[in-house]
């Protein structure tokens, strides 16, 4: 990829060059920390005796060049409406999302060790029938039936709710049933989870390991627009970090961040109170480095991309351009400004993402296959070493 980049005149941007300079300048520090007098000695210890400072810089440059060129290739890809439609027609359910509750009844939990696999599976199936019977008319009924099972007498049990779960994330065991076009809210079923093996006589044996009980609540074709939003983050400051690296903030620290967010929103309201003035304030005051340079803007935001509170505010059905608000996340308090809906739908985004992946993989594999294998300098490689394992 690096060779292709150089052939096409691709050059590293200043940020990448600054990254190389920063890493190189820190080598002396790393060498000192690990007990080496010179950076090159540290490099030799890390990468082998043939390592040099120039070689390391060339490696960094090649790595960043390849990475940057790959990104630029992806950014250059565009797809027509016909291409998007054709991809959609290949298997339209792939771009749907499904909502359902499921509960797994493992055969191993039934009967005692003396029982056969078939007997255990039969007991699990009997319970699966019970919790998906005609008297089960709601998720509440489903969970109540699960809780009443004798196998759950000594524990609390309930189904797992999966909301707007992409088809590609649905278990293959239940995917065909879930995605059936005739499926409607309130449908329920149970499906066996099986494995196949070969017995000592060479015969194929199918074993039931349990049953998935499923209660269907709905689906969406994801034909709704993405959104564009600006925000100003008043990040939490201070905090206490534990041995696992988790940081918690006191009520006082959270209150301080909330007050900052409220002050920022009031400052905006007392000014021009336009999108441009919000963007200017974001550039000046936000603690989110990822959006600071573009006025706090996030474009084409899709469901689940942002943390829950941020996401819920953006996709509130009542949201309209110019709306503002404050939401709390684990990062701090966000002053929100709703720019509006994107021209692209979530479904189109999903399809284009797949098209991009297909195009990139084809491009990358073609590049790799066209490269002639060459052997570099191997003089520093020890060939007289024999590794053995103690038995």
Tell me what each language-model feature is.
Residues 126-177, 263-308, 339-345:
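Peptidyl-prolyl cis-trans isomerase
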């Amino acid at each position: 990829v690096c060779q292709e980049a150089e052939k096409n005149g691709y050059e590293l941007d200043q940020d990448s060059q600054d990254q190389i300079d920063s890493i190189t300048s820190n080598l002396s520090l790393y060498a000192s920390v690990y007990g080496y007098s010179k950076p090159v000695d540290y490099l030799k210890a890390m990468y082998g005796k043939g390592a040099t400072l120039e070689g390391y810089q060339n490696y960094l440059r090649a790595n960043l060049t390849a990475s940057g060129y790959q990104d630029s290739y992806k950014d250059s890809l565009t797809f027509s409406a016909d291409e998007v439609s054709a991809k959609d027609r290949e298997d339209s359910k792939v771009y749907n999302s499904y909502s359902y509750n499921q509960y797994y009844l493992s055969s191993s939990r039934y009967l005692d060790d003396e029982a056969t696999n078939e007997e255990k599976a039969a007991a699990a199936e009997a319970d699966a029938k019970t919790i998906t019977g005609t008297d089960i008319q709601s998720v509440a009924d489903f969970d109540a039936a699960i809780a009443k099972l004798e196998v759950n007498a000594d524990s609390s049990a309930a189904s797992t709710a999966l909301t707007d779960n992409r088809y590609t994330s649905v278990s293959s065991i239940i995917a065909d049933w879930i995605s059936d076009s005739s499926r409607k809210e309130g449908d329920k079923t149970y499906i066996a989870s099986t494995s196949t093996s070969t017995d000592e006589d060479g015969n194929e044996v199918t074993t039931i390991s349990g049953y998935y009980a499923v209660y269907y609540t709905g689906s969406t074709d994801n034909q709704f627009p993405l959104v564009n939003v600006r925000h100003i983050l008043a990040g939490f400051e201070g905090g206490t970090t534990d041995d696992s690296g988790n940081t918690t903030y006191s009520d006082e620290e959270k209150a301080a961040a909330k007050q900052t967010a409220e002050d920022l929103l009031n400052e905006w309201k007392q000014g021009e109170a336009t999108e441009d003035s919000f963007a200017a304030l974001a550039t000046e005051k936000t603690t989110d480095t990822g959006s600071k340079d573009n006025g706090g803007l996030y474009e084409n935001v899709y469901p689940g991309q942002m943390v829950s509170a941020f996401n819920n505010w953006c996709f509130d059905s009542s949201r309209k351009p110019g709306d503002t608000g404050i939401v709390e996340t684990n990062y701090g308090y966000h002053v929100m400004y709703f720019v509006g809906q994107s021209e692209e739908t979530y479904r189109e985004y999903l399809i284009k993402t797949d098209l991009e992946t297909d195009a990139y993989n084809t491009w990358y594999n073609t590049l790799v296959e066209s490269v002639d294998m060459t052997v570099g300098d191997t003089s520093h490689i020890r060939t007289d070493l024999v590794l053995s394992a103690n038995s």
